[in-house]
């Protein structure tokens, strides 16, 4: 289904051409003065120079052609040369009827679907998820869902941090605590136990203890580095411990991501890319891409157009050790080999931009990816507390994600119990649903690249630009529809009608923009545009709700029109919140 702006533009292009002017001047936009009109065209102002004519004369010529169009109810030429447009109520109602009959609600699925690997999440194993992991998970999940909604094949990969010194530290500390474990017996050749030698709680305590000791005890650090080296070079017992670390961590991570309604198609980690590193290093050397500089192996990635210095991409340190660059490039090779994606999209902290510029340029220069494979970096800003500094616990520590979710759910529960007489058990369930909307909408309503303040009071409010306000609006619609059926009404033979008043038309105009908003949000990887849209849509619905008596309307046709409009508004809002990554309760 074509976007409504396209259909309006086609009509205006035709009028410009019939009036003897070029089509490229016929650009139509949403009106920036909705009190005067709904859409506008300022092309006459630009055309005046070309045609050596006063803009208002050109505007009048175009308007003369447009008055014959059935799309518009009102067309005006306004000084100095604006063309103001108002849509016909009949045309708008017909457009929404077609939209309501379309199973995709007017969304045109991609004609040439792309396969896109989405790298988001990125937690380290053996450590609990904390608030710093929130943005990548929420933004990545939303873009994955949006891509699928638009018809693309989206593959989400958590890309675990499961390699490097942290593993050696855990092995060393475990060896000190439980030296008799078979994993440390080099003569042992049997099967290793299926039961892990630690719980997630023990694992989360082992790592910080080991990390702290390594900073004070040089011999301990040396032992950890040696254990890391042995693990990376195939030590059988250490590989067995790594498997347990992954099993225990991933089980816990899945549980925590589930609370956020975030899921991944792939649970791969840095360790999965390791087998690709030796051949990649050899290839980069053999083909002259990599050279030795001060003992390290590097690839030059400067470009003539650079406005700031981009250092070479280091592949191996002078001691032969690999780095994040090495692992990320090997992961790109693995992804190209196994999945052949059209695009790999990284949802990562914006402070890592230089790292990804280096990796992407190296991958392109060394032909590790096809020429037309797109490598995209979506950098996000920091989630801060009210003091403008990164969000912390009250005593200044890093807040665990599960504690943040608990805190938000408690606040939502308190507000629900305060405002309504309701069953405590049901209120708890509702608080979880609404709490998730508070967290996700609070994050996604900000442009991804911007830092933002996580304000618990504001995000959990039922008023203003918040998740709970959006859900409250959806529940209000559901309750009207439920009441209609309880009173013996039917929702089967309803149909959108020509609008009767300004608030109804405003709601219909907002609904008609749904497909354009979703398409634009995907093109720009901008979930915040969906948030802005549904906030406007919720406001338009609530104005309509307060002005119109829906269920007590005596004119049966009008009432059916209102109910059809409610059904479409509910469906559009629910489609949007699904893409944003949360759901609505039945009652609030």
Regions found by a protein language model. Name each.
Residues 1-93, 107-588:
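Non-catalytic interaction-recognition regions
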Residues 101-106:
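A short, compositionally biased domain-edge/stem linker segment
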Residues 94-99:
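Short, charged, solvent-exposed linker or helix-capping segments at domain edges/interfaces
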């Amino acid at each position: 289904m074509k976007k409504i702006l396209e259909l309006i533009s086609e009509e205006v292009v035709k009028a410009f051409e019939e009036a003897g002017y070029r089509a490229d001047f016929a650009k139509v936009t949403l009106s920036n003065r909705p009190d005067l009109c709904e859409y506008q065209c300022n092309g006459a102002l630009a055309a005046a120079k070309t045609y050596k004519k006063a803009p208002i004369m050109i505007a009048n010529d175009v308007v003369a052609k447009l008055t014959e169009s059935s799309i518009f109810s009102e067309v005006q030429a306004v000084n100095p040369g604006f063309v103001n447009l108002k849509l016909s109520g009949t045309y708008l109602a017909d457009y929404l009827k077609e939209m309501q009959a379309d199973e995709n609600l007017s969304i045109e699925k991609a004609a040439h679907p792309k396969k896109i690997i989405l790298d988001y999440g990125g937690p380290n194993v053996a450590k609990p998820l904390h608030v710093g992991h929130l943005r990548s998970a929420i933004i990545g999940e939303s873009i994955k869902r949006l891509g699928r909604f638009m018809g693309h094949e989206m593959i989400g990969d958590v890309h675990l941090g499961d390699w490097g010194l942290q593993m050696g530290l855990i092995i060393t500390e475990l060896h000190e605590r439980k030296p008799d474990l078979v994993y440390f017996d080099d003569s042992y050749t049997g099967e290793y136990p299926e039961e892990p030698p630690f719980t997630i709680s023990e694992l989360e305590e082992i790592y910080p203890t080991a990390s702290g000791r390594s900073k004070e005890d040089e011999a301990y650090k040396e032992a950890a580095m040696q254990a890391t080296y042995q693990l990376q070079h195939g030590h059988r017992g250490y590989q067995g411990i790594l498997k347990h670390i992954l099993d225990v961590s991933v089980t816990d991570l899945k549980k925590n991501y589930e609370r956020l309604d975030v899921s991944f198609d792939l649970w791969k980690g840095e360790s999965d890319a390791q087998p690709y590193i030796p051949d990649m290093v050899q290839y980069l050397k053999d083909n002259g891409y990599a050279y030795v500089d001060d003992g390290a192996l590097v690839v030059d990635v400067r470009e003539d157009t650079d406005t700031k210095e981009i250092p070479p991409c280091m592949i191996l340190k002078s001691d032969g050790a690999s780095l994040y660059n090495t692992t990320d490039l090997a992961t790109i090779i693995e992804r190209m080999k196994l999945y052949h994606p059209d695009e790999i999209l990284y949802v990562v902290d914006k402070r890592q931009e230089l790292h990804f510029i280096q990796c992407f340029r190296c991958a392109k220069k060394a032909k590790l990816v096809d020429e037309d494979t797109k490598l995209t970096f979506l950098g996000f800003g920091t989630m801060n507390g009210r003091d403008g500094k990164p969000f912390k616990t009250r005593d200044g520590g890093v807040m665990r994600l599960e504690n943040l979710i608990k805190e938000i759910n408690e606040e939502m529960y308190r507000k629900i119990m305060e405002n309504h007489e309701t069953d405590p058990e049901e209120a708890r369930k509702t608080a979880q649903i609404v709490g998730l909307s508070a967290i996700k909408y609070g994050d996604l309503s900000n442009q991804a690249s911007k830092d933002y303040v996580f304000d618990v009071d504001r995000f959990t409010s039922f008023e203003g630009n918040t998740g709970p306000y959006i859900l409250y609006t959806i529940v209000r619609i559901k309750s009207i529809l439920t009441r209609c059926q309880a009173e013996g009404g039917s929702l089967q033979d309803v149909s959108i009608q020509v609008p009767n008043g300004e608030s109804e038309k405003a709601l219909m105009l907002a609904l008609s923009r749904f497909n354009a908003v979703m398409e634009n949000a995907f093109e720009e990887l901008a979930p915040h545009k969906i948030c802005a849209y549904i906030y406007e849509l919720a406001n338009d619905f609530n104005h309509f709700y307060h002005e119109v008596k829906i269920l007590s309307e005596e004119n049966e046709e009008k009432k059916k029109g209102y109910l059809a409009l409610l059904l479409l508004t509910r469906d559009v809002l629910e489609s949007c919140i699904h893409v944003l990554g949360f759901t609505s309760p039945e009652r609030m």
